Amino acid sequence: MASMGLQVMGIALAVLGWLGAILSCALPMWRVTAFIGSNIVTSQTIWEGLWMNCVVQSTGQMQCKVYDSLLALPQDLQAARALIVICIILAVFGVLLSVVGGKCTNCVDDESSKAKIMIVAGVVFLLAGLLVMVPVSWTANNVIRDFYNPLVASGQKREMGASLYVGWAAAGLLILGGALLCFNCPPRNDKPYSAKYSAARSAPASNYV
């Protein structure tokens, strides 16, 4: 029962992490304009995402534009787009494996095979979590580096957007859920000990004089 509880918790955390990765990928809030200095137009906020950028006016009006080309993205966001998409696909594969190997499903009858499938699902979720962690941390590092770089103009400085925090949370959930599933050890097939008896040999009769 405890093993089944770990499975359910691991799958639930991994699914939440997968949904968080989708949200982080879709939200155009990876980098947000930093209002520094007097030359920044404070009446608008610029959001930069993986697929589009948005301009939010002080009146609340928002205009979004999809990137015309992949080359319009900086290098870190190009890599982030590819890695996040791979992560989402991997997580879908992990969810399917966890359904097949779940203790409450009848897709596979052998308990040992179920446990092995669940361990593979856990490894897949761990890889998906790392694929989210790398681009999010890379982008955050570039934002912080440019923010404190005196050679970068004030108008080019950005702050970390909400998508980065969502991505970190998604990575943590995927890694934690995958780790719980990896603890699902296959059952031992210990055969009961059977005592074997051999017939005692009769000693040859000795002749006494």
Swiss-Prot record:
Residues 31-81, 139-160 are extracellular. Its main location: other. Pfam families: PMP22_Claudin (PF00822). PROSITE patterns: CLAUDIN. It comes from the Eukaryota. The chain crosses the membrane at residues 10-30, 82-102, 118-138, 161-181. The modification Phosphotyrosine is found at residue 208. It is found in: Cell junction, Tight junction; Cell membrane. Keywords: Cell junction, Cell membrane, Chloride, Chloride channel, Disulfide bond, Ion channel, Ion transport, Membrane, Phosphoprotein, Tight junction, Transmembrane, Transmembrane helix, Transport. One of its GO terms (cellular component) is chloride channel complex. Phosphorylated. Phosphorylation by EPHA2 is stimulated by EFNA1 and alters interaction with TJP1. Residues 208-209 are annotated as: Interactions with TJP1, TJP2 and TJP3. Belongs to the claudin family. Interacts with EPHA2; phosphorylates CLDN4 and may regulate tight junctions. Directly interacts with TJP1/ZO-1, TJP2/ZO-2 and TJP3/ZO-3. Interacts with CLDN1. Interacts with CLDN8. Channel-forming tight junction protein that mediates paracellular chloride transport in the kidney. Plays a critical role in the paracellular reabsorption of filtered chloride in the kidney collecting ducts. Claudins play a major role in tight junction-specific obliteration of the intercellular space, through calcium-independent cell-adhesion activity. This is Claudin-4.
